[in-house]
UniProtKB/Swiss-Prot annotation:
The keyword Chaperone applies. This is Co-chaperonin GroES. The gene is groES. Signal peptide: none annotated. Keywords: Chaperone, Cytoplasm. It is found in: Cytoplasm. SMART domains: Cpn10. Together with the chaperonin GroEL, plays an essential role in assisting protein folding. The GroEL-GroES system forms a nano-cage that allows encapsulation of the non-native substrate proteins and provides a physical environment optimized to promote and accelerate protein folding. GroES binds to the apical surface of the GroEL ring, thereby capping the opening of the GroEL channel. GO terms for cellular component: cytoplasm. Gene3D superfamilies: GroES chaperonin. One of its GO terms (biological process) is chaperone cofactor-dependent protein refolding. Pfam families: Cpn10. GO terms for molecular function: ATP binding; metal ion binding; protein folding chaperone; protein-folding chaperone binding; unfolded protein binding. HAMAP family: CH10.
Amino acid sequence: MNLRPLHDRVIVKRLDNETKTASGIVIPDNAAEKPDQGEVLAIGPGKKDDKGNNIALDVKVGDRVLFGKYAGQGVKVDGQELLVMREEDIMAVVNK
């Protein structure tokens, strides 16, 4: 991927949701909600503080994260649908 986010931005690839309920009902693609989890593919260097020093991000490449349904800006890179969002749009890191 030839994309390097700036500042406190993070590039996330959405993870696929289950398309079948626990009782075995298959949910069609057009009825399924967009997943609110993704994998961090790239991170920016971080925000700058008042003195011009970078404040490192709390997330790292490879983290599985939770974010809001409408978080981020969708972009298409090398045929992949990705999200570019600020770190503050990420609600949590999922521990594996």
